[in-house]
Amino acid sequence: MKIGVFIPIGNNGWLISSNAPQYQPTFELNKTIVQKAEHYNFDFALSMIKLRGFGGKTEFWDHNLESFTLMAGLAAVTSRIKIYATAATLTMPPAIVARMASTIDSISNGRFGLNVVTGWQKPEYEQMGMWPGDDYFGRRYDYLAEYVNVLRDLWGTGKSDFKGEFFQMDDCRVSPQPQADIKVICAGQSDAGMAFSAKYADYNFCFGKGVNTPTAFAPTAARLKIAADSEGRSVACYVLFMIIADETDEAARAKWESYKAGADTEALAWLTEQSGKDTKSGADTNVRQMADPTSAVNINMGTLVGSYANVARMMDEIATVPGTEGVLLTFDDFITGVENFGERIQPLMKSRADVCPQTAASREVA
């Protein structure tokens, strides 16, 4: 099973709590995280894009770096780990993104991939005069399909004459073309998003569900397989989880309870308000799950809380879900979290025996 790190491009990572570590996003922080991830044989690093935060007393995600320029810098200071940036497709024409991707492909020597997002938080785009109107909620994947068609034209042939509703290319050129096949990923979870990923994406990210319920996302993975089968394609599922680990279950649980107790209610109220703006996409979107009050303090991503050994066991359970190729990880404290994963969790995982062969051999002897 492949492992990636969802790096903290925004302040405070993914915990909306005054009791969680408080920090600003910097290149140096993310360089340290990704270099440590590479040292421990993580397979990839992904950064999101966020153009406006949630506010509140923690100023959650009010401070963000930009994804492409950050990942270009990280590509230059790594050598093996794959690097994924995120394109906010309402803000950048596909021909520009195609050229930027080709540039980072050159910097990384073929290690670059692209995550594409349609945009769900209206104020991010409205503040710049770039929101196309609320009808966009119902048509955003039509827009994204045309966008990816243009990208693949330009990466594949260096030229596009694509004519669609949203984009019209006229002998558009991009050269040099990327040296490696640039993988396109999406995080579609609604029916429309899943249909898009089934037709156009190489991988699809989905949210894990619940606390210490590592296989609860299985129905989402099954939906993806059905959608991909209908297109005659194979699209791997990658699932998002947060790890909160310590020497004992009790110590890890105490941290989790503290984070929940310090939840930034003002920032969470903003998230809930924004999640209600999309009345077109149904109840199964990522943002609706993020705003669910059950575990909103970490936007309801799947959460693994426990001792290093128990987290390793739950990670192996994730690997048993059909169609699951990898896990995208966040941590309550990223630098310590990546180190502990590499030193204390990964060596215990049967699903990572390929990167820890000596540890796997010792388990078999025992």
Curated annotation (Swiss-Prot):
Xref: InterPro entries: Luciferase-like_dom, Luciferase-like_sf, Pyrimidine_monooxygenase_RutA, SsuD_RutA_monooxygenase
EC number annotated for this UniProt entry:
1.14.99.46
Q: Which residues cross the membrane?
A: none
Could you tell me what reaction this enzyme catalyses? uracil + FMNH2 + NADH + O2 = (Z)-3-ureidoacrylate + FMN + NAD(+) + H2O + H(+); thymine + FMNH2 + NADH + O2 = (Z)-2-methylureidoacrylate + FMN + NAD(+) + H2O + H(+)
The record, for CDD domains, names: Alkanesulfonate_monoxygenase
Binding residues annotated for FMN, in chain numbering: 49-50, 115, 124, 140-141, 190
Keywords of this protein's UniProt record, alphabetized? Flavoprotein, FMN, Monooxygenase, NADP, Oxidoreductase
Q: In which domain of life is the source organism classified?
A: Bacteria
Residue spans making up a coiled coil are none
Gene3D superfamilies tied to this protein:
Luciferase-like domain
- According to its UniProt entry, what is the function of this protein? The FMN-N(5)-oxide reacts spontaneously with NADH to produce FMN. Requires the flavin reductase RutF to regenerate FMN in vivo.
Q: What is this protein called?
A: Pyrimidine monooxygenase RutA
Specify the species.
Serratia proteamaculans (strain 568)
